[in-house]
Design a protein with these regions (language model features):
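Alpha-helical bundle segments that constitute or directly flank the non-heme di-iron/ferroxidase center
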Residues: 16-50, 110-134
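Charged/polar positions within long, soluble alpha-helices
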Residues: 39-46, 70-77, 81, 98, ...
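Conserved alpha-helical segments that form or flank metal/cofactor-binding pockets of metalloenzymes
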Residues: 53-91, 157-160, 164
Length: 169
């Protein structure tokens, strides 16, 4: 049972209160997305043909999602529940990573990086949605920090994709 933690938003104009169940739902949604992102970046790192440094960048992004997972799990547990197990397996990738379905080894690095960028697009959308909720201050701070990291990485992945596409031309 979720520990009853009713939390008032810091926004003086927002009169709504988000209960612990709702907060945990938001955090679990981000947790599933982080697990999917980790799996997606690992798959991309395994599929790219380019330099070792590109593989290392993609694996570093997977590690970033792993760290986000750990932070989200810890926050969920402060509500007295265990986090969802969804997305924990290394199985199928979610819709945002669909371009990797099938034989990713037949794809160019630019195509693989485009799949990474689409995955980051999905992560940005999930974080924006979460930040639109009336989250407790400590949860909002965590979500905001993670969101900013996803935005930075999205820009980096886009730059890598653009460079890989230019090399193909």
């Amino acid at each position: 049972m979720i520990e009853e933690r009713m939390v008032q938003s810091e926004d003086p104009f927002a009169g709504s209160v988000m209960d612990g169940d709702e907060v945990v739902d938001v955090l679990n949604d981000l947790l599933v997305m982080a697990r999917t992102g980790r799996n997606g970046f690992v798959a991309c790192a395994e599929a790219v043909q380019a330099t070792r440094s590109l593989k290392e960048i993609l694996l570093s992004r997977a590690q970033g999602f792993r760290q986000a997972e750990a932070q989200l799990v810890a926050m969920i547990r402060t509500y007295g529940v265990e986090p969802t197990r969804k997305g924990a397996g290394g199985g199928g990738l979610q819709r945002s990573w669909r371009p990797l379905d099938g034989n990713a080894g037949d794809r160019s690095d630019a195509e693989i990086l485009r799949a990474c960028e689409l995955g980051e697009d999905a992560a940005i959308a999930r974080y924006r949605h979460a930040l639109g909720e009336q989250l407790p201050v400590e949860v909002r701070d965590l979500v905001q920090r993670q969101f900013e990291g996803v935005q930075r990485n999205h820009a980096k992945i886009r730059g890598l994709r653009d460079a890989a596409g230019a090399r193909r031309s």
